[in-house]
Each structure stands twice: as structure tokens, then as C-alpha cells.
Curated annotation (Swiss-Prot):
SUPFAM superfamilies: Acyl-CoA N-acyltransferases (Nat). One of its GO terms (biological process) is ubiquitin-dependent protein catabolic process via the N-end rule pathway. It comes from Variovorax paradoxus (strain S110). It is found in: Cytoplasm. This is Aspartate/glutamate leucyltransferase. One of its GO terms (molecular function) is arginyl-tRNA--protein transferase activity.
Length: 249
């Protein structure tokens, strides 16, 4: 069982937010449980928090704490037994010409412009398509844990890096990689999002890490339901990571 009382987190405090409109399910109210203070949430503490279903947005570490709703279920891919589907293998083949460069978190104007194009093309009207540089920085480039920025560029004929196509933010935890956020050229047919997850699974394998944490799976949300296509995976139900076949609503 993975409960907060069992973890070495006695120095942290937890509070519940007031209700706010749910970002994923229409006509629902959401609440979050927030871990504070942020300066004490180092990589070991955050790794433990992720085991209990927490995520981070910048310096904000939270998990769903909604009244009467359990739709947001943490999901992690089992790296060593992962079996890609035909469409996932196709995404890897389609983007085998991308060159990945792993960086520390840093602001690059070209990344920010791609972020705005992505928000406008894929999530127009969602409130993030007009994010300022400060908002972008607070959301993606602030972290007290072991975070990385990965940029993916198209390879030119001479093997050098060309046009920017995608950026992924990830955290390297004690037992896996946590996918924070990915944005890319908003071409709906390109399969960049699938390729990003496949790349992170392969990176976890190279690092000897058994899991890739994809955040919350929400069965009724088209934006989140795709995560269940990466199999085998486990869901965090009632404090225990378990196979989907063991879970009955």
C-alpha cells in the first residue's frame, strides 16, 4: 500500500484547494490536494509523492482531491514489459529522422513560439493560447527536482539539426521518468505525442528505470484517454498500483 503516512514526508504539509471548474470533464467541479512548502520537495520527496499520485506544474505539487469523483487515475507504463502497438511502431518509424537534444531547463524563444502555436492549434480557447513568457516559464521551466528539457529537431541531409518540431519536459525520478508536458507542431496527422512517449519509454529503459509516469488517465476525456494505449500499464487505485484487469469500478 502507498499511503502518505508510510512515506518520509513528515516535513511537508498538505491542504485542499477551493473548488474550481474541471479542465477535463464538462460541468464538473474539481479540487486539488497541494503539498507544501515547495522548497522542501526535492527529488527524493517528489519521487515518493508521485508514487502516491501527485504531479507537478512548475513548483506546484498536487493530486486530485475532488468531492465525489475519482475519474483522474494515475497511470504508469511498465517499461521492461512494454509492447508497442502497430500505430506506436509506425509513429517511431515516421519520426526516425528527429534528432533529440537533452538540455537543462532553459528559456529559448523558439521553444516559446512553438508552445504558442501548439496551444492555438490544439487547445484554442483553453486559456493557455495567450500565455505570457512569465506564465510559460512558471509552468514549464521552474523545478526543484531532476528535470530535463528535450528538443526534437528535424535532421538535415548532412546530419545536422534543422527545424524545431517538438519539445518535451520530463522529470527523472528514483524509479522512472515522469512525463510533465509535451508540445509540438500542431499537425494532427504527425503523431508527435505518441513518438514523445515512445522516446521516453526507451530513455527509461536505457537508464534502467522501470516506469514511465504519464499522469492521470481519465476514461471519459478524449484528451487523457490515449494514455491507456501504452501497455502494459498500472493504475493507482485505493493506494495500490495494480493492473487494469484488477480494477473494477
Amino acid at each position: 500500500m502507498t499511503h502518505l503516512k508510510d512515506l518520509p514526508l513528515h516535513t511537508l504539509q498538505f491542504y485542499a484547494t477551493a473548488p474550481y471548474p474541471c479542465s477535463y470533464l464538462p460541468d464538473r467541479q474539481a479540487r486539488s490536494q497541494v503539498a507544501t512548502p515547495s522548497h522542501l520537495i526535492h527529488n527524493d520527496a517528489y519521487s515518493d509523492l508521485v508514487l502516491s499520485g501527485f504531479r507537478r506544474s512548475g513548483m506546484f505539487t498536487y493530486r486530485p482531491y475532488c468531492d465525489g469523483c475519482r475519474a483522474c487515475i494515475p497511470l504508469r507504463v511498465l517499461v521492461n514489459s512494454f509492447q508497442p502497438s502497430r500505430s506506436q511502431r509506425r509513429a517511431v518509424k515516421q519520426h526516425q529522422n528527429l534528432l533529440a537534444r537533452v538540455l537543462k531547463l532553459c528559456f529559448v524563444p523558439e521553444h516559446y513560439k512553438l508552445y504558442l502555436r501548439y496551444q492555438t492549434g490544439r487547445h484554442a480557447g483553453g486559456g493557455m493560447d495567450h500565455d505570457s513568457i512569465d506564465q510559460y516559464t512558471q509552468f514549464l521551466l521552474q523545478s526543484r527536482v531532476n528535470s530535463r528539457l528535450v528538443e526534437f529537431r528535424e535532421a538535415l541531409p548532412d546530419g545536422t539539426a534543422g527545424a524545431l518540431k517538438m519539445v518535451s519536459i520530463l522529470d527523472v525520478l528514483n524509479d522512472g521518468i515522469s512525463a510533465v508536458y509535451t508540445f509540438y507542431e500542431p499537425d494532427s496527422s504527425a503523431g508527435y505525442g505518441t513518438y514523445s512517449v515512445m522516446w521516453q519509454i526507451e530513455q527509461a529503459r536505457k537508464l534502467g528505470l522501470p516506469h514511465v509516469y504519464l499522469g492521470y488517465w481519465i476514461e471519459g476525456s478524449a484528451k487523457m484517454n490515449y494514455k491507456a494505449r501504452f501497455a502494459p500499464h498500472e493504475l493507482l487505485i485505493d493506494g495500490r498500483w495494480q493492473a487494469p484487469s484488477d480494477f473494477t469500478r
